[in-house]
């Protein structure tokens, strides 16, 4: 099976499984298993997949057919041009959340050496992005759940965000300290229980009921 055949096969399998954005996801899966960029795939679409790549492809498709989030399958996802570790217990970085980061950066344009607090930090994608885009900032990431905090800690190291620090605790218990901040941002992964029934099955993996 070559790359082009694998892409078409993946696309059909995802469409049959009812995956809404099956074209986009098929492209992401092929990129993941080959390690190729979009342009490299176009130049090498007749290349045969190795046995390892075919086995990996089959495993990914099976997991996705069960509606396990693609981002969790990969173990990472891109946000604002950077790759972040993700997995069970954290909200996956989403393209529409990049708007939040943009709004924060716009707000901070007139602020020198800003002090920033990212509540319910999860993977840390927002706080770390702000830390990388504003190297003069001091960013505190506060996360209540240890499992999610581990991802934030790994991502701080991965992105070499030396001006970001992680605190594990509950802001409602005062664990954020009494420091004054120029900006407080939060994108908590909580959805009311009565709404969980009407959202996509995939999103139930990505949220915590309240």
State what each model feature region is.
Residues 29, 187, 203:
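Conserved RecA-like P-loop NTPase ATPase core
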Residues 34, 171, 208:
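Hydrophobic pocket-lining residues within nucleotide cofactor-binding pockets
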Residues 98-198:
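Conserved SAM/SAH cofactor-binding pocket of Class I
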Residues 1-34, 38-42, 46-49:
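Non-catalytic accessory regions of SAM-dependent methyltransferases
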Residues 7, 26, 57, 67-70, ...:
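A general structural signal for well-ordered alpha-helical segments in protein cores
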Residues 204-210:
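Conserved small/polar residues in nucleotide/adenosyl-binding loops
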Residues 31-106:
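Conserved AdoMet
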